[in-house]
Amino acid sequence: MNIIEQLEAEQAAKIAAKRTLPDFSAGDTVRVNVRVVEGSRTRVQAYEGVCIARSGGGLNESFTVRKISYGEGVERVFPVYSPLVESVEVVRRGKVRRAKLYYLRDRRGKSARIVENTGTRARKLNEAERQAVAEEKARIEAEKVAAAQALAAEKAAAEAAEKAAAEAKAAEAAAE
């Protein structure tokens, strides 16, 4: 493995430790939660549509999501390893025979529909995904509880130190 591949693998592992993306391909309806910066505020915006392509490899891998917004087709390309992509949820698995669904650009209405994949592989992926999401939520909740307990203990220690200092000051004043 050359140096560039090694660096890419390290970066991919670093990002994968923070968040894991589900296994999805072209034809799947996905909801991408994107971090949007507006001035000094940041918020998370959901972008839901059909994944029409996955391209590239390694750190340069990206996927294209198409949705219809107010009657106008909108496509957005998301890098898989972008820090702005907070999470990706697979809403529905699609059954298609192509890797690139660019032909959907020319279609409207019923002809642009994608049949839902109800095969065993899709069901297994959906179940595994739901379980992974539940585990992730439980882990985050546990981290929040631990952080709250640590903060409460820190506050209690600070109050005790403050109380002891006040008592020492009062004892010193009484001694004079």
Curated annotation (Swiss-Prot):
One record GO biological process? translation
User: Which GO molecular function terms does the record list?
Assistant: structural constituent of ribosome
Alphabetical list of InterPro entries matching this protein: Ribosomal_bL19 (IPR001857), Ribosomal_bL19_CS (IPR018257), Ribosomal_bL19_sf (IPR038657), Translation_prot_SH3-like_sf (IPR008991)
The record's section on SUPFAM superfamilies has: Translation proteins SH3-like domain (SSF50104)
Q: What Gene Ontology terms describe where this protein resides (cellular component)?
A: cytosolic large ribosomal subunit
Q: Does the keyword Lipoprotein apply?
A: no
Please report which protein family the annotation says this sequence is part of. Answer: Belongs to the bacterial ribosomal protein bL19 family.
The protein's job, in short, is: This protein is located at the 30S-50S ribosomal subunit interface and may play a role in the structure and function of the aminoacyl-tRNA binding site.
Protein name (record):
Large ribosomal subunit protein bL19
Can you name the source organism? Sinorhizobium fredii (strain NBRC 101917 / NGR234)
Taxonomic lineage of this organism? Bacteria, Pseudomonadati, Pseudomonadota, Alphaproteobacteria, Hyphomicrobiales
Q: Report which gene this protein is encoded by.
A: rplS
